[in-house]
């Protein structure tokens, strides 16, 4: 076995995904699922601590991550009427969505899926084709929008908002960027060039021969490009398949929901705090590397622990702290993502807001009365005005100040392509400065602002262009978790590991469609 073969992980994952149904009996799952669901019910305290039943669907064909998280609105009694649909059953998202449809109709319950870790999907999370190699049509778009209303924009395996290759004019695009797919087996897009016999499954790499294409793999892997691709597809077929809201999540496999940079407990047990975790390999694979001597990642290894991200959390504007209300907020996409800080952010769109509304003490009530919240569509345009927006962002009470509030806009062009632009809506007077001391892993809240309340109107609005808008909130610079580790454990970090970063929040979009 060649330990430096970059395809080892691909073959390993394919082996897992290719397990025959009779390898494990469905009956084996019943007591496990019963124990899990009843344990969740045991700790669910409506109004105090809400625990949602869920599981992860985990296909990764050719090492491309297509994972989804399935979340239930229901209690154990209803959830136990089914056995979870797994990647052994199918690696096609359409089959998962059909399973969710059947669950809803047969049990009277309700469940949705949330796409997970798109940045390492090899361009497959927001594709141009369905799982059978056919162009996306309205049936696919409607099914996906119904059963998969949310996308995870940030987590421990990197940030999925955008990539500097996709957004070269965005100064904040290169944040916790991962390259390649989950197994680091591919850095270029692989395209089918021939069919081998009667095998027609485009998600099974054994069915096709591949070649590397010079085009990068990023389109279809990142949230912003997915939103833009959705507009482009809508212009062709009349339906947007990627009209999703945003959340963040940890993806930690330790049951420790600790994403603070100074209290980060890693992804797996082997990446919990300790002197050697920074230069060890994620999931315990590979060999020790003295990164202080300048060596990065050997070609046969997976991701190094220094690359994992202390992220993220899901913000949900629910009417009450209960399963039912949180789930309903998921469905209406009134959600946002943060990379770890508990930033609070509101985002409303309207044709009728005025700057005076941003000073109203009943800001939130005005937002709902005169406009629509994040995750919504602007109503039909009845005036010649540009859309205007109200934004409120407040710092984590125990965290760093805020440096700026931005609106990210995407729109379609006459030729069917799409464009994007990032607008600075509000800036602190000292934006661009830093107080980080990497030697002591400290910073000061002597710069930035504790809160921004903003009114913004689109200065470039074209009523003929489909568009989306979402808010990005940027903190002042703070130490990265690896810097805290360096100080606590006395590790010497190589130069290529960032000492500081700027954490952030992303809201779900608000969409505009021409009449």
What function would you assign to each model-found segment?
Residues 1-109, 113-129, 510:
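A metal-dependent hydrolase metal-coordination microenvironment
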Residues 22-25, 35-40, 55-65, 104-111, ...:
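C-terminal functional module detector
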């Amino acid at each position: 076995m060649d330990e430096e073969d970059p395809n080892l992980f691909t073959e390993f994952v394919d082996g897992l995904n290719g397990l025959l149904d009779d390898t494990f009996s469905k009956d084996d799952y019943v007591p496990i699922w019963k124990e899990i669901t009843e344990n969740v019910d045991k700790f669910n305290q409506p109004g105090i601590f809400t625990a949602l039943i869920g599981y992860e669907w985990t296909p990764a064909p050719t090492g491309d991550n297509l994972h989804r998280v399935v979340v239930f609105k229901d209690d154990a009694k209803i959830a136990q009427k089914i056995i979870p649909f797994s990647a052994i059953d199918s690696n096609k998202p359409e089959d998962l969505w059909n399973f969710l449809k059947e669950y809803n109709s047969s049990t009277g319950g309700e469940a949705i899926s949330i796409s997970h870790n798109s940045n390492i999907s090899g361009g497959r999370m927001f594709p141009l084709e369905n799982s059978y190699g056919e162009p996306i049509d309205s049936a696919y778009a409607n099914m996906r929008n119904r059963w998969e209303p949310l996308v995870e924009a940030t987590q421990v395996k990197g940030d999925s908002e955008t990539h500097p290759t996709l957004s070269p004019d965005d100064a904040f695009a290169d944040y916790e960027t991962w390259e390649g797919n989950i197994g680091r087996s591919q850095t270029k897009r692989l395209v089918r060039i021939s069919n081998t016999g009667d095998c027609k499954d485009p998600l099974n790499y054994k069915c096709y021969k591949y070649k590397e294409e010079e085009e990068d793999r990023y389109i279809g892997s990142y949230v912003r490009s997915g939103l833009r691709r959705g507009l482009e597809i809508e212009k062709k077929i009349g339906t947007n398949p990627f009209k999703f809201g945003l959340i963040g999540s940890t993806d930690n496999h330790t049951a420790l929901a600790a994403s603070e940079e100074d209290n980060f407990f890693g992804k797996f047990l082997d990446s919990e705090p300790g002197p050697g975790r920074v230069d060890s390999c994620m999931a315990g694979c590979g060999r020790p590397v003295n990164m202080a001597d300048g060596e990065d990642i050997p070609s046969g290894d997976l991701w190094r622990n220094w690359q994992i991200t202390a992220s993220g959390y899901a913000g949900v504007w629910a009417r009450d702290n209960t399963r039912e209300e949180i789930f309903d907020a998921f469905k209406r996409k009134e959600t946002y993502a943060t990379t770890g800080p508990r930033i609070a952010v509101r985002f409303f769109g309207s044709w009728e807001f005025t700057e005076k509304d941003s000073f109203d003490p009943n800001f939130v009530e005005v937002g709902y009365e005169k406009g629509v919240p994040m995750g919504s569509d602007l109503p039909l345009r009845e005036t010649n005005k540009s859309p205007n927006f109200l934004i409120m962002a407040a710092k984590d009470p125990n965290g760093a100040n805020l440096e700026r509030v931005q609106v990210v806009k995407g729109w379609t062009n006459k030729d069917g392509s799409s464009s994007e632009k990032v607008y600075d809506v509000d800036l602190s007077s000292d934006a661009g400065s830093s107080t980080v001391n990497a030697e002591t892993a400290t910073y000061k809240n002597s710069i930035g602002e504790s809160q921004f309340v903003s009114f913004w109107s689109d200065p470039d609005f074209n009523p003929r262009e489909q568009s989306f808008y979402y808010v990005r909130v940027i903190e002042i610079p703070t130490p990265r978790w690896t810097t805290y580790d360096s100080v606590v454990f006395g590790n010497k970090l190589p130069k290529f590991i960032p000492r500081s970063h700027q954490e952030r929040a992303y809201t779900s979009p608000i969409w505009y469609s021409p009449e």
